[in-house]
Curated annotation (Swiss-Prot):
The gene is ruvC. HAMAP family: RuvC (MF_00034). Keywords: Cytoplasm, DNA damage, DNA recombination, DNA repair, DNA-binding, Endonuclease, Hydrolase, Magnesium, Metal-binding, Nuclease. This is Crossover junction endodeoxyribonuclease RuvC. GO terms for cellular component: cytoplasm; Holliday junction resolvase complex. GO terms for biological process: DNA damage response; DNA recombination; DNA repair. PROSITE patterns: RUVC. It comes from Mycobacterium tuberculosis (strain ATCC 25618 / H37Rv). The keyword Magnesium applies. Pfam families: RuvC. Belongs to the RuvC family.
Length: 188
């Protein structure tokens, strides 16, 4: 499975591509950071991110895009910009029929390091080890994008099982409702 990991941001947006093999075997295929000037207009910054992400999607053809879910930070402007960048990325993927999944920072840290409170240095060290990279990915946005892709690769089987179980439960509930309504109608 090819997974594009994205650490969204307006100033720096980390992009990565990982391919999963048997078991927990992973191969890093590409990683980059899209940068936009902080003094540029918001629309221009989002357009630059969109153009870069669309190029990645059209070049690498991932099956899934894993994006970091934005949580409350102290700076509301930063949160809004990050969320807007994430929305542009999700839209670009959706337009191409590529599945999009969001993962929380603590979920990613736990998947990669075993500790949901790990710091950036620990995440970077584990990403380097897991992917057998020759050097640590820099800046942190690149390492975070790789960590997101790793997290999704390792969680994908669980996500698929949960979706299948939910679908079966919904189908059973619909059948039960149909049977109940038929019983009510027959009782009239």
């Amino acid at each position: 499975m090819r997974v594009m990991g994205v650490d969204p941001g307006l100033t720096r947006c980390g992009l990565s591509l990982i391919e999963s093999g048997r078991g927990r075997q992973l191969t890093a295929l590409d990683v980059d950071v899209v940068r936009t000037p902080s003094d540029a207009a918001l629309a221009q910054r989002l357009l630059a991110i969109s153009d870069a992400v669309e190029h990645w999607l059209d070049t690498h053809h991932p099956e899934v895009v894993a994006i970091e879910r934005v949580f409350s930070q102290l700076n509301v402007t930063t949160v809004m910009g990050t969320a807007q960048a994430g929305g542009v990325i999700a839209l670009a993927a959706a337009k191409r029929g590529v599945d999009v999944h969001f993962h929380t920072p603590s979920e990613v840290k736990a998947a990669v390091t075993g500790n949901g409170s790990a710091d950036k240095a620990q995440v970077t060290a584990m990403v380097t080890k897991i992917l057998a990279l020759q050097a640590k990915p820099t800046p942190a946005d690149a390492a975070d994008a790789l960590a997101l892709a790793i997290c999704h690769c390792w969680r994908a089987p669980t996500i698929a099982r949960m979706a299948e179980a939910t679908s079966r439960a919904e189908a059973r509930a619909a059948q039960q409702r149909h049977a109940y309504l038929a019983k009510l109608k027959a009782a009239r």
